[in-house]
Amino acid sequence: MEQFHGTTIVSVRRGDKVALGGDGQVTLGNIVMKGGARKVRRIYNNQVLVGFAGGTADAFSLLDRFEAKLEKHQGNLTRAAVELAKDWRTDRMLRRLEAMLITADATTTLVITGNGDVLDPEGGICAIGSGGAYAQAAARALVENTELSPREIVEKSLGIAGDMCIYTNHNRIIETIE
């Protein structure tokens, strides 16, 4: 059975501001099932942003586990991400989950991959999902050549990804921490 998939999530950190955004499209095979899904959320008393890509059920399962780790480690983003990654690598059921997360707080942005890796992105820019490469390239160009805010860069990057990736639409949700 096919899984729901296809999305773009992008995060940009500039100075003391970070933005995390995603599109709203959920695809099953070659059919758009939903155009306004919310794949970017605020968690842990609105102090942490999280965006997810991959199989929808898998992503929600990982999001729930990440929230529990964040609570257990009193909001320490890095510790929660590493603990989730450890579980992901050692738990047979979790290893089958096909999803990725981008998490960000006031000081740190991390990508948690389907292999159980935790990555600290270079230059404060990261993207995941089917349109991730387009969004990341656009964000990098905008960071290097403009003075736009992280929110504006995320918005424009998602727009470019939506123009190029058939699994990404123009219904955007963007959250920021300043």
Swiss-Prot record:
What family, per the record?
Belongs to the peptidase T1B family. HslV subfamily.
Q: How is its activity regulated?
A: Allosterically activated by HslU binding.
Describe the task this protein carries out: Protease subunit of a proteasome-like degradation complex believed to be a general protein degrading machinery.
GO biological processes:
proteolysis involved in protein catabolic process
Q: Which reaction does it catalyse?
A: ATP-dependent cleavage of peptide bonds with broad specificity
Please give the HAMAP family that the UniProt record associates with this protein. HslV
Assembly information from the UniProt record: A double ring-shaped homohexamer of HslV is capped on each side by a ring-shaped HslU homohexamer. The assembly of the HslU/HslV complex is dependent on binding of ATP.
Q: What class of enzyme is it?
A: hydrolase
GO annotation, cellular component aspect = HslUV protease complex; proteasome core complex
Q: Where is the active site?
A: T7
What the entry lists under InterPro entries is as follows: ATP-dep_Prtase_HsIV_su, Ntn_hydrolases_N, Proteasome_sua/b, Proteasome_suB-type
Q: What is its EC number?
A: 3.4.25.2
Q: Where in the cell is it found?
A: Cytoplasm
Matching NCBIfam families: ATP_dep_HslV, PRK05456.1
Q: What is this protein called?
A: ATP-dependent protease subunit HslV
Keyword annotations: Allosteric enzyme, Cytoplasm, Hydrolase, Metal-binding, Protease, Sodium, Threonine protease
Q: Which GO terms describe its molecular function?
A: metal ion binding; threonine-type endopeptidase activity
Gene3D superfamilies recorded for this chain? Glutamine Phosphoribosylpyrophosphate, subunit 1, domain 1
Q: Where does Na(+) bind?
A: G162, C165, T168
